[in-house]
Amino acid sequence: MLISQRPTLSEDVLAENRSQFVIEPLEPGFGYTLGNSLRRTLLSSIPGAAVTSIRIDGVLHEFTTVPGVKEDVTDIILNLKGLVVSSEEDEPVTMYLRKQGPGEVTAGDIVPPAGVTVHNPDMHIATLNDKGKLEVELVVERGRGYVPAVQNKASGAEIGRIPVDSIYSPVLKVTYKVEATRVEQRTDFDKLILDVETKNSITPRDALASAGKTLVELFGLARELNVEAEGIEIGPSPAEADQAAHFALPIDDLDLTVRSYNCLKREGVHTVGELVARTESDLLDIRNFGQKSIDEVKIKLHQLGLSLKDSPASFDPSEVAGYDVATGTWNSDAGYDLEDNQDYAETEQL
């Protein structure tokens, strides 16, 4: 099996909805292969939501006007195409807009149901005079890519229901370039630089993750033809290699107190990997293993970038009573003294 160095992916946030991603090092030629695949998927296959049809009170078709409204119906529809929405519902949902003049009608006047969010409330829709009144019913659906109005026209639709073009894609622009990068003595490896700009309904990071998931699913079809087929295996990341090394460490290397060490040994926990597979509840079930021992273990694991199975990622050693983070020692009022192991003699006698 050929093993390739694992590439790294970094993100540089350029603006609120624009990021530049760098993937390197890639085997020669894979920069264009990956870049083109990601770009096409980002532009065409990221799920989103859009308005598919509208119904305006007193209007039968789009080639007309609304009394008291400056814009005609065609202009209103064009403005609504710019509406940025997201929906958590798989089925079509309905939103309502009701506004009495005079004044400007914006997307912020739309009342969305639960699970639907309007992300550009300042978007202009229409302008009303003193006698103007606008009531609009909007249907929002989830989809991908672009769907023309003719495909949104449902057979048997009620009179006055106007289908509109739907732009589901939440990605506005994607560009990429490939540069040469050095790996040891070789200078022909690829560095892929991907620039992604999105609407407010999704972040560039989430859009790229969605594209990656789609491609993995599709390429998986080819892999299933023969799961034993030989290919280029991506090596472990530095973090994964460090973690594997830490898992193999004996608990002797954690420099635990006598009580904690003996309790774990008696329970059959010999390596760090076996320790992190336990929960706090598991450890508390061990005889003579109390909360102070739990705190000690959590601190030692935190120093390695690890944690117990159910420990929160937000664990902060400085919040443990009696522990001095600056010196890495316990204060005398912590309940035991690391310099005096007499507290743990009972464990030795068990």
Curated annotation (Swiss-Prot):
Its EC number is 2.7.7.6. Signal peptide: none annotated. Residues 336-350 have a biased composition (Acidic residues). The keyword Metal-binding does not apply. InterPro entries: DNA-dir_RNA_pol_insert, DNA-dir_RNA_pol_RpoA/D/Rpb3, DNA-dir_RpoA, RBP11-like, RNAP_asu_C, RNApol_insert_sf. It is an enzyme of class 2 (transferase). GO terms for cellular component: cytoplasm; DNA-directed RNA polymerase complex. GO terms for biological process: DNA-templated transcription. GO terms for molecular function: DNA binding; DNA-directed RNA polymerase activity; protein dimerization activity. Residues 328-350 are annotated as: Disordered. Residues 1-226 are annotated as: Alpha N-terminal domain (alpha-NTD). Keywords: DNA-directed RNA polymerase, Nucleotidyltransferase, Transcription, Transferase. Residues 241-350 are annotated as: Alpha C-terminal domain (alpha-CTD). Coiled coil: none annotated. The keyword ATP-binding does not apply. It catalyses: RNA(n) + a ribonucleoside 5'-triphosphate = RNA(n+1) + diphosphate. It comes from the Bacteria. DNA-dependent RNA polymerase catalyzes the transcription of DNA into RNA using the four ribonucleoside triphosphates as substrates. Homodimer. The RNAP catalytic core consists of 2 alpha, 1 beta, 1 beta' and 1 omega subunit. When a sigma factor is associated with the core the holoenzyme is formed, which can initiate transcription. Belongs to the RNA polymerase alpha chain family. The N-terminal domain is essential for RNAP assembly and basal transcription, whereas the C-terminal domain is involved in interaction with transcriptional regulators and with upstream promoter elements. HAMAP family: RNApol_bact_RpoA (MF_00059). NCBIfam families: PRK05182.1-2, PRK05182.1-4, PRK05182.2-5, rpoA. This is DNA-directed RNA polymerase subunit alpha.
